[in-house]
Curated annotation (Swiss-Prot):
Activity modulation comment: Activated through phosphorylation predominantly by ATR but also by ATM in response to DNA damage or inhibition of DNA replication. Activation is modulated by several mediators including CLSPN, BRCA1 and FEM1B. Proteolytic cleavage at the C-terminus by SPRTN during normal DNA replication activates the protein kinase activity.
GO MF terms, alphabetically ordered: ATP binding; histone H3T11 kinase activity; protein domain specific binding; protein kinase activity; protein serine kinase activity; protein serine/threonine kinase activity
Record's compositionally biased regions (Polar residues): 298-320
Gene: Chek1
Keywords recorded for this protein, A-Z: ATP-binding, Cell cycle, Chromosome, Cytoplasm, Cytoskeleton, DNA damage, DNA repair, Isopeptide bond, Kinase, Nucleotide-binding, Nucleus, Phosphoprotein, Serine/threonine-protein kinase, Transferase, Ubl conjugation
Protein's name according to its UniProt entry: Serine/threonine-protein kinase Chk1
Pfam family, any one: Pkinase
Principal cellular location given in the protein's record: nucleus
Active site residues of this protein: 130
Similarity comment: Belongs to the protein kinase superfamily. CAMK Ser/Thr protein kinase family. NIM1 subfamily.
Location relative to the cell: Nucleus; Chromosome; Cytoplasm; Cytoplasm, Cytoskeleton, Microtubule organizing center, Centrosome
Keyword Hydrolase set for record: no
Subunit structure: Interacts (phosphorylated by ATR) with RAD51. Interacts with and phosphorylates CLSPN, an adapter protein that regulates the ATR-dependent phosphorylation of CHEK1. Interacts with BRCA1. Interacts with and phosphorylates CDC25A, CDC25B and CDC25C. Interacts with FBXO6, which regulates CHEK1. Interacts with PPM1D, which regulates CHEK1 through dephosphorylation. Interacts with TIMELESS; DNA damage-dependent. Interacts with FEM1B; activates CHEK1 in response to stress. Interacts with TLK1. Interacts with XPO1 and YWHAZ. Interacts with CDK5RAP3; antagonizes CHEK1.
Biological classification of the source: Eukaryota, Metazoa, Chordata, Craniata, Vertebrata
Length: 476
């Protein structure tokens, strides 16, 4: 069951955890509107109140179609609530196939929208500082929106620009000048991160662990060894643009106005007929069978204590995506009630609550939004019942050396290290659906592409029990 929050609104699921608190999903039980609620415990760290105040101030400045909306905030004692748009198309990383990428025309379209969002941010003096696919969300029309401004800062005010000196972001996406511990301009740093995102979209992999001379892949790039991966998978026109973006000297790096003049950026790409997308989870979608799904618009980046610009802040996590609700344009009057309300209580096991449609189905409603499954590429049906499927999963985890625990009814939390020796955590739910068992994988912390690689490895180990049954998502 959902937990009442304020009048007509329920808290129905935890979306992510971070250094200072968590993100919950709030749903209006009458209109089915959905809003992400960032719940912050201000006592978690000395610098928490100042950081949250800064995040709220920045969010209040934002209003653009390619940036997530900020609805408002309120505080109760030591708890601060931030209310934000809840996007319905998922995270960008879910559209990137590991080691393959995505169709070039899709990458170009997303890159256009990313540029539009970044141009807007820079135009009002804001730098994001943690641009990556986990922080780029899609709405129900596949329009890209930039999310999570926990590391963002103002670099220009009243036409006066200040240099930055803080190391923050996610290592594979940061610009090389950040690692030199010197002052640097803000805008070229975001441009560099956008270039890494474009590389990931076109090649399905990140080019290096970090842009330093100690990294062989980065040295190879500087020596123009484009016959190596990932560059050899990228066509010459977009590769030429990447050669202008991923330039070590920030003063020589291409600017966004010049990116917009680039040949590939302006090249009309033939989209052709829209084909059903075969997914790595044995699912498919078609233009006649599409279900909206909801994902969080927050990434809780870990923040170290201390507020000076010299602090190192690297992000390595993102929220867990997680329920299949219809999302309509959120009405201001309803959100006002949510922002101003005062009642709050905590769900005991929200992940299981929402994944198991039997728990939240409303009697008499054969197609109510609670029963719609999240559309995601990382899932499959098994040929076994729940208990036997669970046993096979446990055996596979042990063979692969994963740490795991049963964290909730029909849910397993798995921890491991990725190829960069960073923590990777994902959750697996076993869901009974049409008398079949669906094994649903969701990223909790870590790199999205690494998560998908581990999913494919696990699925391969379980090939004997994986069903070929596909799910066709209904029109909503």
């Amino acid at each position: 069951m959902a937990v009442p929050f304020v009048e007509d609104w329920d808290l129905v699921q935890t979306l992510g955890e971070g250094a200072y608190g968590e993100v919950q999903l709030a749903v209006n039980r009458i209109t089915e509107e959905a809003v992400a609620v960032k719940i912050v415990d201000m006592k978690r760290a000395i610098d928490c109140p100042e950081n949250i105040k800064k995040e709220i101030c920045i969010n209040k400045m934002l209003n653009h179609e390619n940036v997530v909306k900020f609805y408002g905030h309120r505080r109760e004692g030591n708890i601060q609530y931030l209310f934000l748009e809840y996007c319905s198309g998922g995270e960008l990383f879910d559209r990137i196939e590991p080691d393959i990428g995505m169709p070039e025309q899709d990458a170009q379209r997303f890159f256009h929208q990313l540029m539009a969002g970044v141009v807007y941010l820079h135009g009002i003096g804001i730098t994001h500082r943690d641009i990556k696919p986990e922080n780029l969300l899609l709405d129900e029309r596949d329009n890209l929106k930039i999310s999570d401004f926990g590391l963002a800062t103002v670099f220009r005010h009243n036409n006066r620009e200040r240099l930055l000196n803080k190391m923050c972001g996610t290592l594979p996406y940061v610009a090389p000048e950040l690692l030199k511990r010197k002052e640097f301009h803000a805008e070229p740093v975001d441009v560099w991160s956008c270039g890494i995102v474009l590389t990931a979209m076109l090649a399905g992999e990140l080019p290096w662990d970090q842009p330093s001379d100690s990294c062989q892949e980065y040295s190879d790039w500087k020596e123009k060894k484009t016959y190596l991966n990932p560059w050899k998978k990228i066509d010459s026109a977009p590769l030429a643009l990447l050669h202008k973006i991923l330039v070590e000297n920030p003063s020589a790096r291409i600017t966004i106005p010049d990116i917009k003049k680039d040949r590939w950026y302006n090249k009309p790409l033939n989209r052709g007929a829209k084909r059903p997308r075969a997914t790595s989870g044995g699912m498919s979608e078609s233009s006649s069978g599409f279900s909206k799904h909801i994902h969080s618009n927050l990434d809780f980046s870990p923040i170290n204590s201390g507020s000076s610009e010299e602090n190192v802040k690297f992000s390595s996590s993102q929220p867990e995506p997680r329920t299949g609700l219809s999302l309509w344009d959120t009405g201001p009057s309803n959100v006002d009630k949510l922002v101003q309300g005062i009642s709050f209580s905590q769900p005991t096991c929200p992940d299981h609550m929402l994944v198991n449609s039997q728990l939240l189905g409303t009697p008499g409603s054969s197609q109510n939004p609670w029963q719609r499954l999240v559309k995601r590429m990382t899932r499959f049906f098994t040929k076994l019942d729940a208990d036997k499927s669970y046993q096979c999963l446990k055996e596979t985890f042990e063979k692969l050396g994963y740490q795991w625990k049963k964290s909730c009814m029909n849910q397993v939390t798995v921890s491991t290290m990725d190829r960069r020796n960073n923590k990777l955590i994902f959750k697996i739910n076993l869901v009974e659906m049409d008398e079949k068992i669906l094994v649903d994988f969701r990223l909790s912390k870590g790199d999205g592409l690494e998560f998908k690689r581990h999913f494919l490895k696990i699925k391969g180990k379980l090939s004997d029990i994986v069903s070929s049954q596909k799910v066709w998502f209904p029109v909503t």
